[in-house]
Design a protein with these regions (language model features):
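Conserved alpha/beta core of the MobA/IspD/sugar-nucleotide pyrophosphorylase nucleotidyltransferase superfamily
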Residues: 2, 6, 150, 154-194
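N-terminal glycine-rich phosphate-binding loop and ensuing alpha1 helix
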Residues: 2-52, 59
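Short glycine-rich anion-binding loops that position phosphate/pyrophosphate groups of nucleotides
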Residues: 12-14, 54, 75, 105-108
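Short aromatic/basic micro-patch
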Residues: 25, 109, 143, 183-184
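Hydrophobic residues at beta-strand termini and immediately following loops
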Residues: 26, 70-72, 132, 175, ...
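Conserved N-terminal catalytic core of the sugar/cofactor nucleotidyltransferase
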Residues: 33-99
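Short beta->alpha linker loops
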Residues: 53-54, 74, 78, 147, ...
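Conserved beta-loop-beta/alpha segment of the NTase-like Rossmann-fold superfamily
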Residues: 76-146
Length: 194
């Protein structure tokens, strides 16, 4: 099977939190470093981190890790521009990628095991989309097979993965990720997980 890469979206300005959540410490490392390390452990290749606000600090925090940083100057436009930026970078590094996982950086319980399970579902289910299920919804991370790269590259505004999951429900396999409901947007969220 062709390689599966990952795009980790880390461009936001964490407006509700008031400081870069990408750099919050959880389990002895930053949230972003945790997700990067789990992606590397799962043998996802390449690992592309999309930055925007706080680009310099985020780049510095990942020094020494074998990742590619893709800066999105249009980060304030929403998630779609980050996905497009990451996909362009990923395909320049791995033109024959069979799939890409789009991940956010504020789900502290993401694991290499979850990433591996998504890749396995992609390989065995016959489906080209693999989404995580939690709290009665489908959400991130989401794996997109290469047949969806063209559609991904046309996303705009605040559109993210959910748009495609709704448009192509017959092509979606799911992986349970109950901890996916837990993400960090506020100080209260952070206190709850510590």
């Amino acid at each position: 099977m062709d390689k599966t890469g990952v795009i980790i979206l880390a461009a936001g300005d964490s407006s509700r939190l008031g400081r870069p959540k990408q750099l919050l410490t959880f389990g002895g490392k930053t949230l972003l470093a945790h997700i990067v390390d789990e992606a590397l452990e799962a043998s996802l290749d390449p690992v592309v981190v999309v930055t925007g606000a706080y680009a310099a600090a985020i780049g510095e925090s990942l020094k020494g890790r074998p990742v590619t940083i893709a800066h999105n100057p249009r980060w304030a436009e929403g998630m779609a521009s980050g996905i497009v930026t990451g996909l362009i970078e990923l395909l320049s590094l791995q033109p024959s990628a069979g799939g890409v996982i789009v991940s956010v950086c504020d789900q502290p319980y993401l694991s290499a095991g979850l990433f591996r399970e998504m890749v396995q579902q992609f390989g065995t289910s016959g489906k080209s989309l693999v989404a995580c299920s939690y709290g009665g919804i489908l959400g991130t991370p989401v794996l997109f097979g290469s047949r969806y790269f063209g559609v991904l590259s046309t996303l705009s505004g605040t559109q993210g993965a959910k748009k495609l999951l709704k448009e192509y429900p017959q092509d979606v396999a799911t992986v349970p990720f109950p901890e996916g409901e837990i993400d960090i947007d506020t100080e209260e969220d952070l206190k709850r997980i510590k």
